């Protein structure tokens, strides 16, 4: 039976089609087995039905999506195929500017904000023939001024498709829910300190934070200029590689963009394979505590890799104030990024009480304070770099737990000792690439993730590790119980 017959009574493509990977959907579009228009219509219909139940979208861009889908369909029929994302729907986190549409940054005082231009990543995707079906919901200001609970969003708390009494994590909350529930095959997320990796882990999908400077951030809201990254959240690690190959590249309008050539990311199944057996360091000291079943799930994932040629060696993250340095860098840089909002007093309109006041405290830091933190940061980066003399990638859990209940505060704001070596803080601070992919389920039937971290600029290595695991496991094929 061809895909055009695989429909529900409402003429929407079946879940078996909508849960296909980016690569599989792209191949079917290229081969004429799937129409970009019917694919867009199906994802739009599903998004309009399930998106509100999850608080997953800030805006659904139906008119734009259908316009782009029809254009893609005509081009492909005429033999003008632009590449693996041509005619393929996606969602973009609502901190990425899309001309003519609201870009609210998830924040109540900016609910009517819009821009007259597209972010560089949107321009790249337009040139690739991709189809934007919506702006994904997010935590207000991506948590840049702090927050204490998952309801700190203009659109309300984003609910986890695996259990709507649980949260998706933040700040790329909508992007995680959208991909997990097959409202789109992939989405743009942003990550300053775990905002791609946490929703990826909690939602049971694959998500990648590229090396710092690999993807242009022009037209995306800034939190911390020296730590912000944009990256793909998708069904598989292979999907992340495909999407990253389109998003990556030098942008002269982003002063932190890597130089031409260095910033490019060529990707194919051949480049995704490691030429030598992967040397993987299993981090043994990065979480204060892990929930029951998580450590064994990660160990089982690493045994799969070991069975297929990788070497696994236990290693400790060198001691140091990684989390403090990451947090202080974000606090100081966000005080500058959101200066207008703070000085005007409009931060009082934010939903979360932490965000309402945090900016004022952050502006009390001095230039000397900032420089001292950056000196410490340079030392910590050198310590972490030494680990990659022995390993290609480092591995640990995607997060220290499965998804938290909607009414629970983020773990870092709960009572207990600070996670001084949490990998999201360490690798974000050092500008390292990382990917999280699903590796199991908790006793509550919520996803666990395993995370791979690579040396700066070696984005291929983390994809290779995740791809090797996914080629010998089925956790990425799980579907949440939502329809």
Regions found by a protein language model. Give the residues of each.
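An N-terminal boundary/leader segment
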Residues: 1-68, 77, 284, 307-309, ...
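Glycine-rich, small-residue loops and helix-cap segments
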Residues: 32, 87, 127, 131-133, ...
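Short glycine/serine-rich loop segments
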Residues: 117-250, 428-451
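A short helix-breaking turn/cap at a secondary-structure junction
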Residues: 206-299, 472-483
């Amino acid at each position: 039976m061809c895909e055009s017959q695989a429909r529900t009574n409402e003429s929407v493509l079946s879940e078996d089609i909508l849960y296909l990977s980016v690569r599989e959907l792209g191949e079917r579009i290229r081969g004429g087995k799937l129409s970009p228009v019917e694919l867009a219509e199906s994802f739009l219909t599903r998004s309009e039905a399930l998106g509100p139940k999850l608080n997953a979208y800030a805006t659904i861009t139906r008119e734009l999506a259908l316009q782009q889908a029809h254009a893609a369909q005509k081009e492909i029929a005429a033999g003008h195929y632009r590449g693996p994302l041509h005619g393929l729907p996606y969602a973009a986190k609502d901190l990425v500017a899309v001309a003519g549409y609201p870009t609210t940054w998830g924040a109540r005082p900016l609910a009517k904000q819009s821009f007259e231009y597209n972010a560089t990543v949107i321009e790249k995707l337009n040139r690739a023939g991709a189809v934007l079906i919506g702006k994904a919901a997010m935590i207000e200001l991506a948590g840049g001024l702090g927050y204490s609970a998952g309801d700190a969003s203009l659109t309300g708390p984003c609910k986890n498709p695996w259990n709507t009494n649980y949260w998706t994590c933040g700040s790329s909350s909508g992007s995680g829910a959208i991909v997990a529930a097959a409202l789109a095959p992939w989405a743009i997320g942003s990550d300053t300190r775990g905002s791609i990796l946490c929703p990826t882990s909690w939602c049971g999908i694959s998500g990648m934070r590229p090396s710092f400077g690999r993807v242009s951030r022009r037209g995306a809201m800034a939190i911390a200029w020296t730590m912000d990254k944009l990256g793909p959240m998708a069904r598989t690690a292979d999907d992340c590689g495909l999407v990253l190959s389109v998003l990556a590249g030098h942008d002269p309008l982003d002063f932190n963009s890597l130089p031409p050539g260095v910033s490019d990311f060529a990707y194919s199944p051949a480049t995704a394979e490691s030429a030598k057996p992967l040397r993987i360091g299993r981090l043994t000291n990065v979480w204060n505590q892990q929930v029951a079943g998580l450590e064994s799930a990660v160990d089982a994932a690493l045994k799969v890799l070991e069975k297929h040629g990788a070497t696994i060696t236990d290693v400790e993250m060198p001691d140091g104030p990684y989390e403090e340095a990451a947090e202080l860098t974000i606090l100081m840089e966000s005080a500058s990024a959101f200066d207008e909002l703070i000085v005007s007093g409009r931060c009082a309109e934010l939903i979360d009480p932490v965000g309402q006041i945090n900016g004022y405290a952050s502006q009390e830091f001095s230039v000397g304070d900032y420089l001292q933190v950056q000196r410490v940061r340079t030392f910590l980066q050198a310590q972490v770099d030494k680990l990659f003399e022995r390993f290609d990638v480092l591995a640990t859990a995607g997060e220290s737990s499965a998804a938290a209940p909607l009414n629970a505060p983020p773990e870092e704001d709960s009572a207990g000792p600070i996670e001084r070596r949490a990998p999201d803080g360490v690798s974000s601070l050092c500008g390292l690439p990382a990917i999280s992919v699903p590796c199991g389920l908790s006793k509550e039937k919520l996803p666990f993730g395993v995370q791979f971290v690579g040396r700066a600029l070696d984005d291929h290595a983390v994809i290779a590790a995740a791809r090797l695991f996914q080629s010998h496991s089925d956790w990425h094929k799980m579907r949440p119980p939502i329809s």
